[in-house]
Amino acid sequence: MGAAAAEADRTLFVGNLETKVTEELLFELFHQAGPVIKVKIPKDKDGKPKQFAFVNFKHEVSVPYAMNLLNGIKLYGRPIKIQFRSGSSHAPQDVSLSYPQHHVGNSSPTSTSPSRYERTMDNMTSSAQIIQRSFSSPENFQRQAVMNSALRQMSYGGKFGSSPLDQSGFSPSVQSHSHSFNQSSSSQWRQGTPSSQRKVRMNSYPYLADRHYSREQRYTDHGSDHHYRGKRDDFFYEDRNHDDWSHDYDNRRDSSRDGKWRSSRH
C-alpha cells in the first residue's frame, strides 16, 4: 500500500459548506472523532474559499467514526455532507455491504406479499363459490320450507295438543292451509327426487330427533306429557268401546237370527 492510498484512507471529503466556515472551525469539529492532522479548504482563482474541504486524520479508524458522528450536522444553518475520499478503500466496501442488505431487505417483502395475497384471494373465491352452490339450488329452499313446517307442526301441534293459537301466532286454519300446501309441494319434490335423496330426507326427518331425548328431559314437562297421555288413553278407550259395541251387536244379531230360525221351525 502506497503513501497516497494510506492518506486517502485517512481522509474525508466534507461538502455543502457555508462560505463563513473556516479551517479552524472544521478542525475543532472533527477533532471530536479523533486526532486531526490537517484541514484544507480549496480556493478558486479569485481566492474565495470553495464549498468543500478535506479533513486528514491521524488514525484510519477515526474516518468511519467521524462520518457516523458528524454527517448532516448544520454549520451556519447548512447541513454538511461527509463522504469517503475517492481512492479510499472504505468507499467501495461500504457501498457493496450496504447496498445488498438494503436490496434484500426491500425485495423479500415484495416477493412474499403478492403470493400471500393471491392465496388469500383464492381461498375467498373458493369459499364464495361453495356458498353460492349451496344456496342457489331451488330444491334446497323447498326442502328447508318443508322441514320447517313439519318441525313446527310436530312440536306444537302433536306434542303439546291443539290450541287456538300456537307460539308462532297462526290460527289452526292457516296451519292446515300451510300444511296442505307443504304436503303438495313435498309430494312434487318426492316425485322428482331419486331414492337415495329420499332416504337421506327420511333419516333427517325432525320427529326422529325426539327419540334421542333422555328420560329426564322426556318427563320434565308433566303437564304437557299428562295431557298427551290423556288424549292417547281416551283414544284407546274409545277404540275399546267401539270393539265392545261391535261385539255386542254381532252377538245380538246372531241371537236374533237364531230366534228367527227357531220361530220359523215351530
Swiss-Prot record:
Q: Where is the composition biased (Basic and acidic residues)?
A: 209-266
N-acetylglycine is found on G2
Q: Where is this region: ZCCHC8 binding?
A: 25-35, 59-76
Tell me where in this chain the RRM domain is found. Answer: 10-87
PTM note: Phosphorylated at Ser-136 by MAPK14/p38-alpha-activated MAPKAPK2/MK2; this phosphorylation is stress-dependent; this phosphorylation decreases its RNA-binding capacity therefore affecting RNA nuclear exosome-mediated degradation. This phosphorylation mediates YWHAE and YWHAZ interactions.
Biased-composition ranges, Polar residues, are 90-115
* Biological process terms in GO annotation: meiotic cell cycle; regulation of alternative mRNA splicing, via spliceosome; snRNA catabolic process
Where is the protein situated, by its record's location annotation? Nucleus, Nucleoplasm; Nucleus
Quote the annotated effect of L29E. Answer: Impaired interaction with ZCCHC8
Phosphoserine found at:
S136, S137, S204
Quaternary data? Component of the nuclear exosome targeting (NEXT) complex composed of MTREX, ZCCHC8, and RBM7 that directs a subset of non-coding short-lived RNAs for exosomal degradation. Interacts with ZCCHC8 and SF3B2/SAP145. Binds to MTREX through ZCCHC8. Interacts with YWHAE and YWHAZ; these interactions are stress-dependent and RBM7 phosphorylation dependent; release RNA from the NEXT complex and may affect RNA targeting to the nuclear RNA exosomome for degradation.
For the region Disordered, give the residue spans.
90-118, 162-266
Q: Name one GO molecular function term.
A: snRNA binding
What happens upon changing L25E?
A: Impaired interaction with ZCCHC8
UniProt-reported outcome of changing S136A: Impairs phosphorylation. Impairs phosphorylation. Prevents PROMPTs accumulation to >50%
Q: Report the protein name in the record.
A: RNA-binding protein 7
Question: Where are the Omega-N-methylarginine modifications?
Answer: R152
Q: Where is the composition biased (Low complexity)?
A: 173-188
**What is the protein's known function?**
RNA-binding subunit of the trimeric nuclear exosome targeting (NEXT) complex, a complex that functions as an RNA exosome cofactor that directs a subset of non-coding short-lived RNAs for exosomal degradation. NEXT is involved in surveillance and turnover of aberrant transcripts and non-coding RNAs. Binds preferentially polyuridine sequences and associates with newly synthesized RNAs, including pre-mRNAs and short-lived exosome substrates such as promoter upstream transcripts (PROMPTs), enhancer RNAs (eRNAs), and 3'-extended products from small nuclear RNAs (snRNAs).
Q: Which InterPro entries match?
A: NEXT_complex_subunit, Nucleotide-bd_a/b_plait_sf, RBD_domain_sf, RBM7_RRM, RRM_dom
On tissue specificity, the annotation reads: Ubiquitous.
